[in-house]
Amino acid sequence: MQRYEITGMSCAACASHVEKAVSAVPGVAGVAVSLLTNSMQVDYTPDADPDTTARRICNAVEAAGYGASLATAESENAELEDTETPKLKKRLIASLCFLVPLMYVSMGHMIGLPLPSFMEGHGSGAMVFALVQLALTLPVCWINRAFFISGWKGIKSRAPGMDALVSMGAGAALLYGLYAIVMIGIGLKNDDMELIMQYRHDLYFESAATILTLITVGKTLEAYSKGKTTDALKSLMKLAPQTACVLRDSEQVMLPVSEVQVGDLFLVRPGESIPVDGTVTEGISSVNEAALTGESMPVDKFPGSPVSAATINQNGALTCRAERVGQDTTLSQVIRLVRDAAATKAPLAKTADKVSGIFVPAVTCIALLTFVIWLLLGQTFTYALARGISVLVISCPCALGLATPVAIMVGSGVGAKNGILFKTAASLETTGYTDAVLLDKTGTITTGEPSVVKIVGTRNVPAKFLLSMAAGLELRSEHPLARAILKEAEKDKLSYATVADFEAVPGKGLQGKVAGKVIAGGNADFIRETCELTSDLERAGEEMSRDGVTPLYFSLAGKPAGVIGVSDVVKQTSAEAISQMKALGLQVVLLTGDNAATAKHIGAMVGLDEDHVIAGVLPAGKEAEVRRLQAAGRVAMVGDGINDAPALTRAETGIAIGAGADVALDAADVVLVRSDLADVPAAVRLSRAVVRNIHQNLFWAFFYNAVCIPLAAGVFTGIGITLNPMIASAAMSLSSVCVVTNALRLNTFNPRSAAHDAPPKHKAPARELPAETVCETRSCPVKNEIKTEEVTMKKTIHIEGMMCGHCEATVKKALEALDGVQSAEVSHEKGTAIVALTADVADADLKAAVEAKDYTVTGIDA
């Protein structure tokens, strides 16, 4: 994917024309243009030469009347800076310097303001009156010549935009004023006072100047508001320090952050921002990570802990080793994800895009038709012209074009500030449509790190001694449960027993010798081979199992030594998070590979009944569970991305939780930086708020044009309602401002607040979970029977435009959504999708499904 900077765009029609021009370039597989950031993202076909294609793209954009250049790191950062508003402010101030005296001259006499004597009268004074207005109007036209230049380029390339409407409206008023001067001259020559009087009051110069100035007012407010939409990213970028204290040959050297290399040791003092991603090598401190995760509580850091750029060291000095620098830091990835999401198109934007593509030609035709109809109805040329100009300048494609992207940009920024990263505009929109949430257990509901929760010793082996002995035995084991015992011993500052003759017995446990005595640890059956367990230990182990805790039994010198309970601890926020999901109208299902007893216990702890727990599922079976849950509606799969990538890809929305520094997980649509399940309902809330905001914006944009165009055309003249061109231009200017301002309200939205949680008002009809999915264990033969369909046929689809794993996931989802398609194996490297069919699916349907996602089908083989 290549990013380009685009110049010269002023409205949604411009963006549509650029997309159309670039889409026709050979070697282009897909293109998305962002009016908000004046940028374009292009996917190349696998056989495209990057340099040649880039040159062709720039030429195509320039031929369409705009400018294009390859984006660089500097230009990407610069695009977040608001350089447009200061320029527009200067234009506005300069325009007002001429407009104010122009309005005094042209309209002051209407409210009793005096005019100089040489402008009064019906003789030469009328000509002076007209020429002074012309002299004050021409500078305004020159100051705002960008409208005329851009508008003419658009007309010339048969791709008119908003600037074409403005330039035609203002230009028509200016030309009519020049015509009026000529007619006044003829009247003076022929001493025709009636002709002079007629055109003296119909000069329209003030309309031309006012249209341009008011549009500039709107553009200035719009630019300012658009600049505010990237405040979240700007605040993140400002947090990153420009310099770093790097240790070179034991000396502290201050270097620009851009010169820090992987492997460098750098020092961070209390109160300083961490310059790059790294790992702590020396020191203990707490770090404020709110900038990246939204977490208000500082996080303790000690040797071995990861640290991220733009987070703030609070109390102790830290020495760290640089791991990720430059564009590879977590901060840079977050900025890139938010920027890329803003550059993509949400499904809701498609309707607006289609309208924008034909909007300007349609409005131009309406304006001409309005002009002709009023002439045919017997109105004066001046009246008909005023109605036509009003239609031109009141029409606003900008409001349509901005309705979706401004909300997406602000919503993405709010998500980034809270550690919720949406990879595309589509994922930001569709997350809120979720019907059911499938939760992986390990690392999602639980911490993913087993901990010792109970130690039961014997009369001869106290708990502390048992833990020390067990730690010595587990020291050489690689099992996850061994790490839990070692961690507990380290927390209690116990020394490990020295173990000799260590041996691991697969599937059973461990054994060795301590001071010449045989020590063994493992499951109950293994320990029974070395000794007879006491009833107390048997009972303690059974209680642990019932509570979802794994019991590890130990023996010493042929006698029972005790039992240690190890469990994957449920996160403190999991139960509340699941409660919030239910309040949002979501059906929540727990998915785990544990046995039924443990699964029931974990489910009960977080508020899930047995009917919403699926146990005994191996990692490879998660995708099948997602597929079956999709019979109930739209599914979101939540996992840590370690062993559930296929399931994340299969779900309508894949949510990776606890990504930390790895925010670019390919399989996920949404990435949660924190390991907090509460961010899942937060993501749903934010998505619904953004969609609600987009609906409001689109309603306003369509409603505004639907009402104002007939109003400007004079449809309501019969009831005394008309609009002159000046009022029409003011209304047009404010329409875009209203849309952007409404989107900016999202900046105040708190996605973690559950105060107003409720099921969505507009969503697909709720469906109960299919009976075969709700089961307590995989051993249940009836409820867990997976319905399979006989595959009758396979087809290979050849596809251009797929570039990565995310492209594969998009095509896979599109194909498997078709009736009769059982599965699809997609490879972006081979450029193919192999579909298994249970019915005869037409090639045209397969092609349409793929091309609806902006990829190109070159052939289908049976």
Predicted regions and their residues:
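Juxtamembrane coupling segments of multi-pass membrane pumps/enzymes
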Residues: 2, 76, 184, 188, ...
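Flexible metal-binding regulatory segments at protein termini and peripheral loops
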Residues: 1-130, 226, 251-252, 332, ...
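Transmembrane helix-loop-helix hairpins at the membrane interface
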Residues: 29, 87-243, 354, 723-725
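P-type ATPase nucleotide-binding
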Residues: 452, 456-586, 596, 608-626
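Hydrophobic alpha-helical transmembrane segments
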Residues: 136-147, 154-157, 171, 194, ...
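Conserved ATP-binding TGD loop and adjacent catalytic N/P-domain core of P-type ATPases
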Residues: 16, 270, 344, 434, ...
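Conserved cytosolic catalytic loops of P-type ATPases
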Residues: 26-47, 55, 59, 203, ...
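Membrane-embedded alpha-helical bundles of multi-pass transporters
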Residues: 111-127, 156, 175, 414, ...
